[in-house]
């Protein structure tokens, strides 16, 4: 099942901002890049924040999630698409527990295609990465 449109990270500019300024956490199958809402607001809306009304500035947008999977992971698009579907399904399950306003990019490592992991292991690994970056509500 796909992520809701409101939670998809789509623009090249957003991806570049996350790669340039975001936190990085690694696991055996993924690298998670996460950009905090406050740092994103400071870098891109310095002058815009002064012109907007106060209540609009405090409106925190929903968490945006993107998945990056290169041909180095697998030459076959079928394999890459299957992994991407498993990741988006796992992120959709975790979506209600995510703090609002974050921009997240999940980068898939080649080990994800080599090991025949199920979506349950992907879910567990993503949950650990999100807890490390303190994106999950109730992280410890």
Curated annotation (Swiss-Prot):
<dbReference type="InterPro" id="IPR014721">
    <property type="entry name" value="Ribsml_uS5_D2-typ_fold_subgr"/>
</dbReference>
<keyword id="KW-0540">Nuclease</keyword>
<protein>
    <recommendedName>
        <fullName>Ribonuclease P protein component</fullName>
        <ecNumber>3.1.26.5</ecNumber>
    </recommendedName>
</protein>
<dbReference type="GO" id="GO:0030677">
    <property type="term" value="C:ribonuclease P complex"/>
</dbReference>
<dbReference type="GO" id="GO:0001682">
    <property type="term" value="P:tRNA 5'-leader removal"/>
</dbReference>
<dbReference type="InterPro" id="IPR020568">
    <property type="entry name" value="Ribosomal_Su5_D2-typ_SF"/>
</dbReference>
<keyword id="KW-0819">tRNA processing</keyword>
<keyword id="KW-0694">RNA-binding</keyword>
<dbReference type="InterPro" id="IPR000100">
    <property type="entry name" value="RNase_P"/>
</dbReference>
<keyword id="KW-0255">Endonuclease</keyword>
<dbReference type="Pfam" id="PF00825">
    <property type="entry name" value="Ribonuclease_P"/>
</dbReference>
<comment type="subunit">
    <text>Consists of a catalytic RNA component (M1 or rnpB) and a protein subunit.</text>
</comment>
<dbReference type="GO" id="GO:0000049">
    <property type="term" value="F:tRNA binding"/>
</dbReference>
<dbReference type="GO" id="GO:0042781">
    <property type="term" value="F:3'-tRNA processing endoribonuclease activity"/>
</dbReference>
<comment type="similarity">
    <text>Belongs to the RnpA family.</text>
</comment>
<keyword id="KW-0378">Hydrolase</keyword>
<comment type="function">
    <text>RNaseP catalyzes the removal of the 5'-leader sequence from pre-tRNA to produce the mature 5'-terminus. It can also cleave other RNA substrates such as 4.5S RNA. The protein component plays an auxiliary but essential role in vivo by binding to the 5'-leader sequence and broadening the substrate specificity of the ribozyme.</text>
</comment>
<dbReference type="GO" id="GO:0004526">
    <property type="term" value="F:ribonuclease P activity"/>
</dbReference>
């Amino acid at each position: 099942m796909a992520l809701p449109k409101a939670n998809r990270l789509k623009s090249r500019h957003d991806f570049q901002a996350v790669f340039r300024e975001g936190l990085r956490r690694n696991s055996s199958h993924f690298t998670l890049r996460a950009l905090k809402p406050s740092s994103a607001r400071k870098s891109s809306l310095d002058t815009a924040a002064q012109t907007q009304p106060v209540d609009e500035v405090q409106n925190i947008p929903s968490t945006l999630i993107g998945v990056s999977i290169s041909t180095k992971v697998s030459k076959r698009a079928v394999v890459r698409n299957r992994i991407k579907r498993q990741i988006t399904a796992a992120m959709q399950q975790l979506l209600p527990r995510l703090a609002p306003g974050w921009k997240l990019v999940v980068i898939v490592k080649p080990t994800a295609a080599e090991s025949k992991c199920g979506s349950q292991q992907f879910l567990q690994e993503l949950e650990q990465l999100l807890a490390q970056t303190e994106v999950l509500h109730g992280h410890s």
